[in-house]
Structures are given as structure tokens and as C-alpha cells.
């Protein structure tokens, strides 16, 4: 478990299919029991870490160490939740408390995405899976998201060329590979979005945190872009898809000129103007 303390989020894959040829360690298919077993292990590991930290911080907090006192208060807020089988991510923290929580690297403080590993027969409509609904309901109770992916089919899809892949998806009655949905859900979980730049024959995708303003997004490409930022010329990917060329987007009045306070949106296609 120590290997995942440094990660930003957890993707929890849960079996959600029946197959007599694939045995389950408990002899039955019960995704909620599987989830709770793992969550219990994570919670117990966190409780052990909190108790160890408490022993150190309590001594320091007896003096005039304000940081120790603040951390002690957070640890005392966390401990009873873990003892009751809860997750740290379900606790409301203010901004200062959250800084302390992040420094503790607790496993149950991390956002989680539940992935139901469904049968190939359920790909077209995951809601038909008798297990997926249970997983979604469980996730909703803790404010998490759940998606369905047929892992065995995804493995097969990954080995196909583009034409074969499209034929496979059409035969299964699905629009896109589950991997695409997994990537989007993971981006959403981490608060990440994408903008694009295009020049000559090269088009690049850049990842940014939701809420990033144009100058800071420009700085992802190069620090000079942020330092000398003048403006951003922006078109939405949906508009380019509709009008099919940059010239047509401009003619339709869909090309926008944005300043330093512009908050970037997912799918923006941008040309940054700068001077240094």
C-alpha cells in the first residue's frame, strides 16, 4: 500500500461479471463486498499512520508550536472517522486543514473512481449489468463516480488496427472504446482539461488544471509565453468540427480574442500572442 501513497487519485477496478471459468477468492461475485474489503484495508493503513503521527504531534503541540497544534486538530478530526470505517475524503476540511491533510498522504483522502469490469455482453448497455447499478449507488453515497468497462474486450480492441477497431465497436453497439471514457473520467477526477495548439503540420494537446487562466496556460508551453502574454486567440473545438476550417470559423465570427483574465475551457484551440 505504501506504493500508492504518492498518487493523486485511485482507480478501483471491481469485478462485475459472472464466469464459472474464473474463480473468485470468496467463491461468489459480490462487488460491494470486494469494494468494502479494499476500503477497509486502506482505512486501517491510514489509521495506523494517523496513530503514529499523533504520538509525535501531541508532544510538540504541548508547547507553543502552532503548526503542531493545527495538525493535531486535523488528526483528531480524522481519527474517529477512520475508526468508524469511513474515508478521509468524506470529511469537510477548510483550506488550511486541507493543506495539512495533503501532507499526510492518507490513502482514503484521495479521490476515487470505481471501474466496474463488466461482461462483453453488457458493453452496449452497461445498465443491463446486474452489478453495475450496485457499484454506481455505492459510489454515489461517497460522492464518487463509477464507469463500466469490459476489460477483456478492451484488451482485444487495443490490438486491432483502426478499421478493425471500428468494425468491432459497431458489432458491439458502442461508439467508442471504454478506455476513452476511463481517460475522460480520470481527467475529471483530477480536475484536468485539455487545450490545443496548431502550427504548420503539428498539432499539440496540453493538459491544464480546471480554472487556469490564459497566461498561466501559455506558460505551460514556455515561460516566455506567460511572461510576455498579450492575448489569446481562441476557437472551440466544437466550432472547428462544425465549420471544418479556421477560415470558416473566423468567417462565422466564432474566433475570440481573450485577455489575461480569460479562464481556459476544455477543448479550446489557442494561439497565444506574446512579446518578450
PLM feature spans:
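C-terminal-of-GTPase-core extension/linker across diverse P-loop GTPases
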Residues: 56-265, 270-276
Amino acid at each position: 500500500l505504501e506504493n500508492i501513497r504518492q498518487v493523486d487519485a485511485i482507480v478501483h477496478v471491481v469485478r462485475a461479471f459472472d464466469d464459472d471459468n474464473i474463480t473468485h477468492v470468496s467463491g461468489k461475485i459480490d462487488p460491494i463486498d470486494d469494494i468494502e474489503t479494499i476500503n477497509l484495508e486502506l482505512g486501517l493503513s491510514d489509521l495506523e499512520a494517523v496513530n503514529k503521527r499523533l504520538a509525535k504531534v501531541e508532544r510538540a503541540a504541548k508547547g507553543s508550536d502552532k503548526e503542531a497544534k493545527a495538525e493535531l486538530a486535523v488528526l483528531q478530526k480524522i481519527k474517529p472517522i477512520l475508526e468508524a470505517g469511513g474515508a478521509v475524503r468524506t470529511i469537510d476540511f477548510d483550506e488550511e486543514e486541507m493543506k495539512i491533510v495533503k501532507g499526510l498522504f492518507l490513502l482514503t483522502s484521495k479521490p476515487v473512481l470505481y471501474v466496474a469490469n463488466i461482461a462483453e455482453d453488457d458493453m452496449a448497455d452497461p445498465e443491463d449489468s446486474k452489478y453495475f447499478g450496485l457499484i454506481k449507488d455505492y459510489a454515489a453515497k461517497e460522492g464518487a463516480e463509477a464507469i463500466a468497462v469490459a476489460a477483456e474486450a478492451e484488451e482485444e480492441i487495443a490490438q486491432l488496427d483502426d478499421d478493425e477497431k471500428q468494425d468491432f465497436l459497431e458489432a458491439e453497439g458502442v461508439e467508442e472504446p471504454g478506455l476513452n471514457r476511463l481517460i475522460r473520467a480520470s481527467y475529471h477526477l483530477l480536475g484536468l482539461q485539455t487545450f490545443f495548439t496548431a502550427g504548420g503540420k503539428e498539432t499539440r494537446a496540453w493538459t491544464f488544471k480546471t480554472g487556469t487562466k490564459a497566461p498561466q496556460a501559455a506558460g505551460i508551453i514556455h515561460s516566455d509565453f506567460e511572461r510576455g502574454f498579450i492575448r489569446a486567440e481562441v476557437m472551440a473545438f466544437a466550432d472547428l468540427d462544425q465549420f471544418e476550417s479556421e477560415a470558416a470559423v473566423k468567417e462565422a465570427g466564432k474566433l475570440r480574442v481573450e485577455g489575461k483574465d480569460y479562464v481556459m475551457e476544455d477543448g479550446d484551440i489557442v494561439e497565444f500572442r506574446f512579446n518578450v
